Amino acid sequence: MLVRSALGVTCLAVSLAAGIACREVVAPERPRTSTEADFQALVDREWNWRLTESPLFASSIGDHRFADRLPDASLQAEDRRAQDTRAFLDELEQIDREALSAEHRIDYDMFAAQLRERLEAHRFKEHLLPINADSGFHTSFALMPQSMRFASPDDYDAYLARLRAFPAYVDQHIQLMREGLRTGMTIPRAALAGVETSMDALVVDDPERSPLWAPFARLPSTFADGERSRLQDAGRAALRDDVTPAYRRFLTFMTDEYLPGARETLGASELPDGRAYYDWLVKKFTTLDLTADEVHEIGLREVAAIRAEMDTVMRQTGFTGSFDAFLRLLRTDPRFYPRTADQLLKEASYIAKRMDAKLPSLFGRLPRQPYGVAPVPEYLAPKYTAGRYNGNPPDGTEPGYYWVNTYALETRSLYNLEALTLHEAVPGHHLQIALANEVESVPNFRRYSYISAFGEGWGLYAEWLGLEAGFYTDPYSNFGRLTYAMWRAARLVVDTGLHAKGWTRQQAIDYLASHTALSIHECTTETDRYISWPGQALSYKMGELKIRELRRRAEESLTGRFDVRAFHDAVLSNGSVPLPVLEQIVDAYIAREQGT
């Protein structure tokens, strides 16, 4: 999975013309109409506005024009951005959509959907929730050096300007969260237990122990000695006098004010206008016109089907006891857990390299950007999930990273590791996102968007694809794959249960614990994530079900002419798209193949 990014670069489901144009086909150049020129000018203007308003996002995609700034996170700025977005949408609606080419009609619809999503997010006051159970603005700031350029003294001075601006940035977020306390728009208290652990490594007396010191520890050797001393002295001062006190102030606010005042209810439906908010989240994160009840029922059906598979695989291990006894065995037998962090990282790296060798048989196009395997940063690890993909700017200066959580090794099961690695690294998030960054024929607002139902659905499909690639030959590993599949199916039940059906936190933990082989620690951290990030967990299974449905359609339509490499290239050729758009892309691919 990926962390939420600035300005909500996701997209709701959109209705598109039936004749969708797939951009992997190069069409002859055609004169651009004045309507298309007006549309492109608006898109370009909004994109530049977006980067100006979100300089951290700009840095993350390799645009360093605003590298000395942090976003304005004040309440006034949030309201102003909503007004600007409304003005962009009003201007867009004055453009005659039908006068655009088929490709630009797709762009029009997706652009409109992004603008409307931002307005809805502001209407529901999502900006008053700048943190969740395992991350937020405070942890993202500590990751900032990964997306910045450090080639010249000017680059370092820009970084120093951001460090010095951090106290005001923290105060703005405290203002947002105080407004949330006043209006009842808060993260549930239960999901924030232990949140202070994510700040322990950020509130440091020695500046050189801060993760934000890293750029000063690797100053280029080409810098003059005097310049190196100046920058390091300035870095120590900024971390000591600005950053650490701001983190300490935020920690005090969290423990003394926010946690005691946070709501005791769990579900998003308990927030102001909460039922409408959760209904919107279901549609946002699935990109489908479904209700919470419909998603819940789909989840129950998937849970039952996967459980039958799990029973079969359990018997293949030679185990003769009950399902619950088998889960206890998996959770307690030391052979299923790494002894050291190095062992876990080496196992994950080996799985990733094995899959690297399989990629040419499954994909026609492979990305240029490499990836590495690394531990989850220490300050994030206690409340973090088992693994996550962390992308980097697509300019080729840094690889992407598959992060593996080496905290609490007794909870990091090895039988799940093949599925986790295929999801987060290749052929999952790294491959999908790196390829999307290389699609130059779509506008930037699409190229750098991340639609959760597509991205997380692809990640779960990538786990399943491991069967075809020769993974999961060990029955315990295959059970781990099914545990992950069950986990995502159970999310449909648990997320809707928590946010639409009044489930308790313990009820959600118990449901995960009784249906998967996840450790109790993972069941707990996952539940807290669902509580604090409502709707997002629905993306995975709903997206995977749609991709597998479309693959079956292609196989049945093309029979002997079906080429899995061409199918995967078609799915990934347009970047991140809503599921209804993906369906039309695949239908267009099938029609082309049938015509050859």
Cite the ranges covered by each PLM segment:
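N-terminal maturation segment of proteins
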Residues: 22-596
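N-terminal secretory signal peptides that target proteins for export/translocation
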Residues: 1-3
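Bacterial N-terminal signal peptides
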Residues: 6-19
